[in-house]
């Protein structure tokens, strides 16, 4: 994909834990941590009401359950929902895997989705925070590399790979 992109390999993300720069949103029984330096363009957090509003309304069982679901399936891990009673984050059990994210709504190619705690290391040996969910920049334009910040939408990044429905078996 980098043959088709104006790729700048400079890593720009600070090696700061995700939660350190997160904004906190309180709801009854839960607290949402949101680090806006990371991509939100997958829109899983907006599937059935926004996760921010669902957190605020989480005294309603359906809103609570949707807030849990929407936050856990944020590919970048930008959103983390804290259960105040259990004193732990809701986090899906993901096996180590890689995936490519495509954005048909914005008609662009998105980041590399890294799941299941696969370590991310820089070329000089820098070890980034190991997380269950993270998205890595493929377009070369993120201001938070190696992480995706959603700039692929602005630059209309195209990886020119066939969609899965077009792949030959």
Residue ranges and their predicted role:
Residues 1-8, 40-58, 69-86, 145-156:
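Iron-sulfur cluster-binding cysteine motifs and their immediate structural context
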Residues 1-44, 48, 95, 107-110:
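Ferredoxin-type iron-sulfur electron-transfer modules and their immediate structural context
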Residues 3-18, 62, 85-98, 159-164:
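Polybasic, low-complexity binding patches
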Residues 12, 143-169:
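Short histidine
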Residues 37-39, 136-142:
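Short Cys/His-rich zinc-binding micro-motifs
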Residues 57-68, 131:
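Short linker/helix segments within small regulatory modules
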Residues 79, 112-114, 134-137, 147-148:
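Short, structured motif recognition centered on aromatic/hydrophobic residues
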Residues 101-126:
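Intrinsic, low-complexity N-terminal interaction/targeting segments
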């Amino acid at each position: 994909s980098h043959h088709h992109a104006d790729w700048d390999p400079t890593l720009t993300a600070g090696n700061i834990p995700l939660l350190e720069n997160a904004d906190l949103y309180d709801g009854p029984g839960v607290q949402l941590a949101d680090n806006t330096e990371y991509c939100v363009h997958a829109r899983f957090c907006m599937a059935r009401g926004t996760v921010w509003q669902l957190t605020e309304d989480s005294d309603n069982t359906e809103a609570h359950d949707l807030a849990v679901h929407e936050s856990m399936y944020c590919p970048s891990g930008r959103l983390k929902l804290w259960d105040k009673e259990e004193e732990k984050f809701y986090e899906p059990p993901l096996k180590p895997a890689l995936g490519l994210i495509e954005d048909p709504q914005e008609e662009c190619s998105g980041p590399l989705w890294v799941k299941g705690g696969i370590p991310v290391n820089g070329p000089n040996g820098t070890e980034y925070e190991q997380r269950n969910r993270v998205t890595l920049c493929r377009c070369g334009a993120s201001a938070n590399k190696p992480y995706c910040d959603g700039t692929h939408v602005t630059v209309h990044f195209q990886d020119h790979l066939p969609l899965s429905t077009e792949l030959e078996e």
